[in-house]
Amino acid sequence: MKHPIHVTSEIGELQTVLLKRPGKEVENLTPDYLQQLLFDDIPYLPIIQKEHDYFAQTLRNRGVEVLYLEKLAAEALVDKKLREEFVDRILKEGQADVNVAHQTLKEYLLSFSNEELIQKIMGGVRKNEIETSKKTHLYELMEDHYPFYLDPMPNLYFTRDPAASVGDGLTINKMREPARRRESLFMEYIIKYHPRFSSHNVPIWLDRDYKFPIEGGDELILNEETIAIGVSARTSAKAIERLAKNLFSRQNKIKKVLAIEIPKCRAFMHLDTVFTMVDYDKFTIHPAIQGPKGNMNIYILEKGPDEETLKITHSTSLMEALKEVLGLSELVLIPCGGGDVIASAREQWNDGSNTLAIAPGVVVTYDRNYVSNTLLREHGIEVIEVLSSELSRGRGGPRCMSMPIVRKDI
């Protein structure tokens, strides 16, 4: 394997992808803690698993190798000291409940096999799982209704966000919300210690220790020379600027970064919830991210005279900026919901714009977004629909649920 990670476009034939099958973490959601854990509803586990399995099999049927985050993470932690280090970091970053000794929780987690350990960390540790010593301190006697020593990680099935493949390397991301911060730790250990990746010296363009947040749902690889990144509710302009500087100084293929400003709200969480590439010259878009005349704030970042200086050009037309960086005379923006104010809002809420391209002009979408799917077909796109009644409750679509590891060049 020459490069274990290789992604130079959004639409090149997908060869290898990383998924996470929803597990116990979804069942550990309760109404009282939905907002804290970034959910609006509680998926029904048996059905969301069936839908996710259908999604994975749909990809396999098209020749895609499907990897699972939970399996790779377990395979990476073969060394005893490595397991202990990983658990220590998970507990520290998860701010595991201070009323239980760190060591007690650590010993409990390390008593499991690797596979069970990963599932337990992802699923969360309930307070009634661990026998603690007799309560002798006042703080221990205080009634505490919070049910977890270690919070569940229900957003993990959105593998797109904690890390993103960019060329032959990747970003391992600092997530904005505390509920998701630990997620990128899995990818850090997989890249460093899993035999599939560890011997290849995979470049890390930006790591999770950088102080400003960036998330993979905002990172779109337009072509070998250009990436687009959303300035969003979850991704900071400062992180984009740092990533651009790192890319320009450490490699010579990517020459432009488009910073696309989108409204900062939950409905438009990441750039890929409102804008995705479906063919060489076709994109889906949610019309509400544009002003009355189609105006937006787009900044084209290019290498400056030195490593710490960027050339920044402002544009107010997404169409014109895309045509410039892609070298196209014409392109098509396909509106989510057909531009109808009700259909577009409804289908965008259920990720109508969040398509996963598995080849040029071939996309995977949620079946429930029938207006958008019909419009895509009318524009010559092959649309492969997957079941979505429970998957969509997490507010993420097929692109959100997948991290491409290898794509063919276009």
From Swiss-Prot:
Query: GO molecular function of the protein, one example?
Result: arginine deiminase activity
- What SUPFAM superfamilies is this protein classified in? Pentein (SSF55909)
UniProt keyword terms in alphabetical order: Arginine metabolism, Cytoplasm, Hydrolase
GO annotation (BP), single:
arginine deiminase pathway
Its Gene Ontology cellular component terms are: cytoplasm
- State the Pfam families in the record: ADI
User: Where is it located?
Assistant: Cytoplasm
Q: In which pathway does it act?
A: Amino-acid degradation; L-arginine degradation via ADI pathway; carbamoyl phosphate from L-arginine: step 1/2
Swiss-Prot/TrEMBL catalytic activity:
L-arginine + H2O = L-citrulline + NH4(+)
Q: Where is the active site?
A: C400 (amidino-cysteine intermediate)
EC number(s) stated in the UniProt entry for this protein: 3.5.3.6
The UniProt entry, under PANTHER family, shows: ARGININE DEIMINASE (PTHR47271:SF2)
Belongs to which family? Answer: Belongs to the arginine deiminase family.
Recorded hits in NCBIfam families, A to Z, give: arcA, PRK01388.1
Put simply, this protein is called Arginine deiminase
Q: Which organism is it from?
A: Bacillus thuringiensis (strain Al Hakam)
